[in-house]
């Protein structure tokens, strides 16, 4: 874990190494100050003239200023190193996530990844800052001050041999109890972030179902769980300072008593005031260093769980990667499923897809229908290699998708996913995800083919209209049409529409399909839909059931051979007819009412 995280220091290695060296200089200067002060006290006691003490006093001031300079420089380099380390670590973590396949992403929730990129990295940054400065300073002060205390104080300094083990035992006990609590806290942070993320992204649904009170209670519960665990940890940590203060005060009382008694009994021959002063000062430095060490242990304990969570992501190997010698060009849009089986997890009891054998020629239009959970989306996800097959092979352009360069493959397979996602930016910027170099005319053409221009032209700023995160300021149908336009700009060899017109009316759906046929005549098109009207003009239609291909054929063939298809078609036609009848009835009633009103007005 440490090796994994330390790889993020990189270009900040010099300031990272410089910080402990500057701290060493600071500590050495600090250790001289009590020694010089003791000599000055002895000189004053012996009645030395001011002129005789000036060189020693000047040297003391010089040492103090030098210590200050070393400390200030260490603070600057420490801050520079820790901020740079956190920046690199955040970049490494974010870039690692970009390499993840869907299978990798399934292992970590989005809220957990956000926590690792923010809270966890902040914790590690604070710990890193303390380690390269305070964790170096405290042991050095402890060693040097302990040595000088024995040199100056002799037997009086033996008090510290009793105090230090007591403090160490108490600190170990506290850390032992606190560590598992911090581990639970970060998992509960994930739940808290998940609650916030769901509420913010689904605010319209929350309000439409009047679920504000439920969401408030859910958030309060998650926040309360975090608070309770933090409170438990803080209660244990609260014993740290009183324990330190008791030991410090007790040590000082004993030192003053023993030192004063020794001075009086020996009349200053075995122990004098200067030695007592320096022993007292060194003792204060020893105990302060112990307090700093306790703070470090607490911070490191808190950061340890964060570091493990970050390292877990950094160490995760992408389940999908480019081959050693990848194919860089997709020949055509033909697709072959050669006895493909797939399951999302090796521990899953059943296959999501079972023995799929399917061959699609380049330029063919394929419709895919099936009930919920029939693995329609799973089937098309394998084409762009969002997942790898468990058994069998998927070929695009006659080449196994595992042999392609991922960028080359996915550039030729445009997908409009079931969950339509837009990003914060203008409409034009969102559409240019399909082709960053697309001209304004090409952007407008794609929008026209997707029937998006019907509403975009109505916005005051047109294609410069700002889209909020996730497309929260446009409707579901508008979002779908923008996502289709984005895919069209790519001009791919394979276009996959995963239930991408479910939120638009049938008339607009038909216009979009006509536009696709004229704009991309040689592109292989796979259209997943719930409405048979969206796929009935396809060259072939696949009926999925339970992860298998139940039937395949054109519209007329399936009406004869597939009971599922026939029942779905009949049901949808009946619903459509009833809807049209209701509309006609409403229209006639409105007309009759209008005539009655007109007649009444005329009579009056």
Predicted segments — roles?
Residues 21-22, 29-42, 63-110, 114, ...:
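Juxtamembrane helix-loop junctions of ABC transporter transmembrane domains
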Residues 328-604:
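ABC-type nucleotide-binding domain
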Residues 93, 97, 206, 310, ...:
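Helix-loop junctions and hydrophobic alpha-helical segments within the transmembrane domains
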Residues 14-16, 22, 63-82, 133-140, ...:
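Alpha-helical transmembrane segments of multi-pass membrane proteins
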Residues 2, 10, 21, 25, ...:
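Hydrophobic alpha-helical transmembrane segments of ABC transporter permease domains
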Residues 11, 99-103, 119-128, 132, ...:
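An intracellular "coupling" helix at the cytosolic face of ABC transporter transmembrane type-1 domains
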Residues 46-58, 148-162, 171, 232-309, ...:
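Helix-loop-helix
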Residues 10, 16-73, 77, 150-155, ...:
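Transmembrane helix-loop-helix hairpins at lipid-water interfaces of multipass membrane proteins
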């Amino acid at each position: 874990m440490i090796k994994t995280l330390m790889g993020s220091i990189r270009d900040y290695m010099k300031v990272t190494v410089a910080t402990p060296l500057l701290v060493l200089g600071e500590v050495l200067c600090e250790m001289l100050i009590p020694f010089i002060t003791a000599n000055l006290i002895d000189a004053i006691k012996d009645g030395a003239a001011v002129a005789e003490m000036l060189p020693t006093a000047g040297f003391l001031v010089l040492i103090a200023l030098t210590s200050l300079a070393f400390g200030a420089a260490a603070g600057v380099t420490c801050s520079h190193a820790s901020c740079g380390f956190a920046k690199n670590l955040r970049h490494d973590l974010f870039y690692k996530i970009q390499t993840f396949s869907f299978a990798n992403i399934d292992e970590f929730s989005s809220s957990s990844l956000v926590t690792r990129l923010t809270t966890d990295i902040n914790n590690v940054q604070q710990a890193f800052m303390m380690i390269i400065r305070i964790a170096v300073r405290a042991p050095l002060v402890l060693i040097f001050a302990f040595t000088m205390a024995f040199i100056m104080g002799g037997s009086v300094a033996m008090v510290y041999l009793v105090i230090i083990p007591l403090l160490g035992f108490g600190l170990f006990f506290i850390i032992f109890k606190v560590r598992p609590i911090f581990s639970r806290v970060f998992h509960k942070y994930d739940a808290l972030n998940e609650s916030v993320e769901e509420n913010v992204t689904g605010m319209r649904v929350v309000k439409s179902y009047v679920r504000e009170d439920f969401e408030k209670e859910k958030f309060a519960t998650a926040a309360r769980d975090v608070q309770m665990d933090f409170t438990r940890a803080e209660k244990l940590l609260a014993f740290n300072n009183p324990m330190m203060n008791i030991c410090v005060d007790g040590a000082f009382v004993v030192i003053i008593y023993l030192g004063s008694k020794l001075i009086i009994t020996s009349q200053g021959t075995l122990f004098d005031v200067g030695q007592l002063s320096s022993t007292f000062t060194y003792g204060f430095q020893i105990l302060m260093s112990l307090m700093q060490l306790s703070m470090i242990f607490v911070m490191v304990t808190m950061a340890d769980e964060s570091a493990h969570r970050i390292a877990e992501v950094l160490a995760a190997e992408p389940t999908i990667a480019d081959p050693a010698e990848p194919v860089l060009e997709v020949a055509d849009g033909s697709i072959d499923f050669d006895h493909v089986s797939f399951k999302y997890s090796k521990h899953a009891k059943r296959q999501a897809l079972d023995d799929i054998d399917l061959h699609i020629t380049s330029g063919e239009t394929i419709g895919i229908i099936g009930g919920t959970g029939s693995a329609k989306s799973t089937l098309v996800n394998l084409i762009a290699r969002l997942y790898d097959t468990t058994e069998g092979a998927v070929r695009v352009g006659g080449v196994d998708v595992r042999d392609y360069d991922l960028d080359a493959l996915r550039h030729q397979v445009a997908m409009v996913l079931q969950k339509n996602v837009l990003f914060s930016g203008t409409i034009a910027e969102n559409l240019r995800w399909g082709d960053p170099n697309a001209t304004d005319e090409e952007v407008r053409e794609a929008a026209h083919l997707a029937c998006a221009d019907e509403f975009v032209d109505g916005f005051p700023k047109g294609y410069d209209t700002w889209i909020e995160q996730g497309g929260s300021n446009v409707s579901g149908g508008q979002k779908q049409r923008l996502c289709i336009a984005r895919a069209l700009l790519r001009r791919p060899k394979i276009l996959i529409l995963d239930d991408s017109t479910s939120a638009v009316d049938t008339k607009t759906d038909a216009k979009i399909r006509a536009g696709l046929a004229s704009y991309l005549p040689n592109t292989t098109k796979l259209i997943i839909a719930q409405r048979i009207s969206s796929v009935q003009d396809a060259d072939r239609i696949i009926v999925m059931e339970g992860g298998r291909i139940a039937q395949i054929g054109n519209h007329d063939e399936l009406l004869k051979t597939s009971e599922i298809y026939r029942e779905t078609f009949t049901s949808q036609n009946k619903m459509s007819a009833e809807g049209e009848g209701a509309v006609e009835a409403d229209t006639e009633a409105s007309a009759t009412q209008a005539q009655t009103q007109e007649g009444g007005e005329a009579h009056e």
